[in-house]
Amino acid sequence: MVLNYKFENFMSFREKVEFSMLAPKSKVKKRFEDNFISVDSGAEILKTAVIVGENAGGKSNFVRSLDFLKMYFKDNEHVRTYKNIVNSNNIKKDCPKEDNTKLSYEIEVLAEKGIYYRYCIETDFLGVLNEKLDYKTQYSQ
């Protein structure tokens, strides 16, 4: 079950974007009591979420970012060049050293037996730059 998903510099998204399925600690929980579950390891997780926005607001690119991340796991193929998905607003043609061509992803999931995994990956035009997987048994929001 996905708890948090963050990505940066993907297609139309320049800044870091975060999508969370964790129930907020606010009045919203009282208004929608049937829309979250509590798990033994400490997290309160929303049952449903909706992504809304205006036309050309990035909803499709958000879903494409998940598809791109899924490619690393499902296809298990060598990373190709993905120049067309890096946010081109971060490329300074006059000074390549200042280019921000790095895509970053972070996803937190709740797996079986109450174990929380966090996977982070950074890629650029050439391939994977950095990758990390860690886990914990208790979740603190």
What are these regions (language model features)?
Residues 1-141:
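P-loop NTPase switch/coupling surface
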